[in-house]
Amino acid sequence: MSNASVRLATPEDAADISRILLEAFTVIREHYNAEAFAVVTPKSEIIESRFTEGPMWVAEIDGRVVGTVSLTTEPEGLYMRSMAVSPTAQKLGIGRLLLDALHEHAVGTGLTRIFLYTLPFQSGARAMYEKHGYRWVRDTTADEWYGVPGLEMEKFVGKENVA
């Protein structure tokens, strides 16, 4: 996979990020209600506005954006959101590359906790997160997130913990 790389995203990547999120979540659309699906597949204008909230990364293969992830700082720690890999690029190590970049950045912030939310039916995503040191924290209720139950996961990072 020597032709795959990860870099910090720029506002010019907003349309590609929106496209990747739509591609990745459309294949599991039936698990979301309309409001939740709109939240996980924001339009490029929403993506552009998020650049003030924290860093975003894109993964590329041969110059084409195939994955994305972003990070915001919250009272509870660093919140990982919008992790997605195009269905055509899954199982190629793109998720690992994105997590590596995110973890490297996280260590530099001095904050130690990264947390995320995923859905129970996304067993592949959960397995990838667990492989990279994330652990289940709690189940979330449908009342907490747009009518869709999920689960919270976390990882503690520091110079000695980065994989």
Predicted regions and their residues:
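Active-site acidic-Proline motif in GNAT/NAT acetyltransferases
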Residues: T73, S86-L92, P120-F121
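Hydrophobic adenine-recognition pocket in adenosine-nucleotide-binding enzymes
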Residues: A9, M83-V85, T118
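A short helix-loop-beta-strand connector motif used in the catalytic cores of GNAT acetyltransferases and
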Residues: I46-V58, Y79
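Conserved beta-strand in the GNAT
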Residues: V58, R64-T72, Y79-A84
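Conserved acetyl-CoA-binding loop-helix of GNAT-fold acetyltransferases
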Residues: V85, K91-E104, A127, K131
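Conserved GNAT-fold acetyl-CoA-binding loop/helix
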Residues: S18-I47
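C-terminal "cap" of GNAT-fold acetyltransferases
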Residues: E48, T112-A163
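A short beta-loop-alpha structural element at the N-terminal edge
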Residues: S5-R19
